């Protein structure tokens, strides 16, 4: 049985364990004075809160802690964000403060920590979510191992620090990613925010959607990871605000190798996981308690790949 906190991804009408492609009251001093939540705030109040965070917390690591804390309690919804009203296959909004999944939680924390301005952070978000910042379904960073992580490293938003933490105990996971099979399994049930089509129009749109993957060759994904067995030794050396990508054993029936994305946050000297928990909300859990959930999983958790969010010049 899969751990309850592992996100699932829908492939056609089937439901497979896959990418979720990240806490209780915070004890950090900054949390005491920044006790609000974005959830339920009107846009003007969100904009004001972001400006205040930017003014009060010039250090990026502090901003990551505070911005991510403002998402605590936000409900989990699978795939809450899309390409907006002009999207061809997914017309969900391009930014959301009312619902998040694990990847969109990490993305919005990144964007609004790097640029604590509502308009500026929203623009930056699209550069994080999409290859080269080009907004379309096919350029969205769908797969962490071959899209999200390498594209954001190339764009200069993150750097891999796995080897800095695990040293010579670092291991490498590999998997063949088939985007063509992933696209070929698309069905009308996966279309978001699109209505009023005749059956023929819907069939044509789904056929076009499936065709996006027809010419995409399979890709060999390779990710370094901190083995789960050494986490107790190294968890306290992971910098607060680090992105952790959960790396799973290769399973041919599952299209991904990264099943979840979350943040590692220091709270009073103890490492916590801050995550958008599947079918729940954004929350905190003690890190080692969280990772113990995966013991005995039928889809083994090999370890975690770690990425540091990098400051951006001019922001």
Could you say what each language-model-derived stretch is?
Residues 14-25:
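Bacterial N-terminal signal peptides
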Residues 64-72, 125-128:
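Short alpha-helical scaffolding segments that buttress acidic/His motifs in well-ordered protein cores
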Residues 244-315:
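C-terminal soluble interaction/assembly domains
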Residues 225-234, 250-251:
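Short alpha-helix capping/helix-loop boundary micro-motifs
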Residues 39, 43, 57-65, 92-103, ...:
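Solvent-exposed, acidic/flexible segments
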Residues 28-32:
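Sec/Tat signal peptide C-region and signal peptidase I cleavage site
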Residues 1-10:
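N-terminal secretory signal peptides that target proteins for export/translocation
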Residues 75-223, 239, 248, 266-270, ...:
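Acidic/His-rich structured neighborhood in mature extracellular/periplasmic domains
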């Amino acid at each position: 049985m899969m751990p309850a906190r592992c996100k699932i991804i829908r492939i056609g009408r089937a439901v497979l364990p896959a990418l979720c492609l990240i806490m209780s009251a915070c004890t950090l001093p900054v949390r005491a004075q920044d006790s609000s939540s974005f959830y339920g705030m009107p846009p003007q109040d969100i904009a004001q809160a972001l400006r205040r965070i930017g003014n009060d917390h010039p250090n990026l690591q502090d901003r990551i802690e505070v911005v991510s804390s403002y998402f605590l309690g936000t409900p989990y919804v699978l795939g809450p964000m899309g390409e907006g009203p002009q999207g061809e296959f997914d017309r969900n909004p391009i930014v959301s403060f009312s619902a998040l999944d694990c990847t969109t939680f990490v993305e919005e924390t990144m964007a609004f920590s790097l640029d604590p301005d509502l308009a500026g952070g929203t623009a930056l978000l699209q550069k994080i979510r999409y290859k080269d910042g080009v907004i379309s379904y096919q350029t969205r960073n769908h797969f962490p191992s071959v899209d999200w992580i390498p594209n954001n490293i190339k764009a200069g938003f993150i750097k891999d620090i796995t080897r800095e933490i695990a040293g010579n105990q670092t291991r490498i996971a590999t998997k063949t990613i088939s985007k063509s099979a992933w696209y070929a399994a698309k069905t009308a049930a996966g279309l978001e925010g699109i209505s009023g089509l005749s059956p023929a129009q819907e069939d044509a749109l789904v056929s076009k959607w499936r065709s996006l993957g027809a010419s995409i060759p399979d890709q060999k994904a390779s990710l370094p990871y901190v083995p789960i067995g050494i986490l107790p030794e190294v968890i306290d050396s992971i910098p607060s605000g680090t992105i952790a990508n959960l790396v799973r054993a290769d399973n041919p029936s599952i299209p991904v190798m990264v099943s979840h994305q979350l943040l590692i946050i220091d709270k009073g000297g103890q490492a916590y996981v801050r995550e958008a928990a599947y079918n729940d909300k954004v929350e905190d859990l003690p890190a080692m308690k969280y990772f113990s959930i995966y013991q005995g999983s039928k889809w083994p958790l090999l370890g975690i790949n770690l990425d540091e969010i990098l400051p951006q010049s001019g922001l």
